[in-house]
From Swiss-Prot:
Keyword Plastid part of the UniProt annotation: yes
Domain of life: Eukaryota
Protein name, as recorded: Large ribosomal subunit protein uL14c
SMART domains in the record: Ribosomal_L14 (SM01374)
Amino acid sequence: MIRPQSYLNVADNTGARKVMCIRVLGGIQGQTANIGDVIIAVVKDALPNTGVKKSDIVRAVVVRTRKGIRRENGMFIRFEDNAAVVINKEGNPRGTRIFGPVARELRDRNFTKIVSLAPEVL
């Protein structure tokens, strides 16, 4: 569950390392985001000479949460960290690589490009 002021790791190679959620687009009553929800975030830590800089405002999709999600078959998926992937307005990732596993629920939310770039889909 990601709320405004929550920090997330960035799971792609855009150059951002940490982002802070400042707005949840959609989600549960517009207050909390789970896996597959789009958020607006501000870059808090970034590598130099890359596509995004510190204090840039970006859109991101949540790909991992410590809270986890329950699937219809009863399985419960939980990750070690909260992570997001920076996207553009069309919903495509701005980076060319995704680091770490992502949840299968992203495919249901039409983020197929992120799922295809991910090294592991759980």
